[in-house]
């Protein structure tokens, strides 16, 4: 049987969305570089989407894009553009325009999570094997339970809650569809990043006294909070 040379298939990827606001280019670039310095494992050479909803149509898009690319980030698409002039500039630069509805699976730097019409059901994705560096596990419309260790460089994503009953050294993103009621439960906290509905902490934002201990991470008043747990 002869196979076709290509095949189109749907898949899910987690991308960071950077919301660009009106500011001098050098200020924007410095802010991006500061973020990369804070979380190099997550952001260095990372693929990102730029949201330009708050960007002035009078901006010099080509110069701004060149400056952003100079930081090492790889811009894969642009969202939030409602101005015809800016749209034309973006198209000329060779980047695709996408709508917010297409970016619901993306983690975001905004303080307001994207709201989704998806409802989390009672299904649970259960994994007993170790999660290795470079692996990505996605629990669509469900909770995710890991009963083993998660290595640095691994990524856990769930539209529901995430439970890790092992050493957690990777990234955990709960409420990936925008559900702010989701939580992360972990037996041994050493994560590179934790996120709930787009709100995130990198490793050095987690209280030092809770590292290596059990904790529950949740959203309170649109900000991440952590509560020690005793098993």
Curated annotation (Swiss-Prot):
Keywords: Cell cycle, Cell division, Septation. SUPFAM superfamilies: Cell-division inhibitor MinC, C-terminal domain (SSF63848). Coiled coil: none annotated. It comes from the Bacteria. InterPro entries: CAP/MinC_C, MinC, MinC_C_sf, MinC_N, Septum_form_inhib_MinC_C. Pfam families: MinC_C, MinC_N. GO terms for biological process: cell morphogenesis; division septum assembly; regulation of cell division; regulation of cell septum assembly. Interacts with MinD and FtsZ. Cell division inhibitor that blocks the formation of polar Z ring septums. Rapidly oscillates between the poles of the cell to destabilize FtsZ filaments that have formed before they mature into polar Z rings. Prevents FtsZ polymerization. Belongs to the MinC family. This is Probable septum site-determining protein MinC. It comes from Baumannia cicadellinicola subsp. Homalodisca coagulata. The gene is minC.
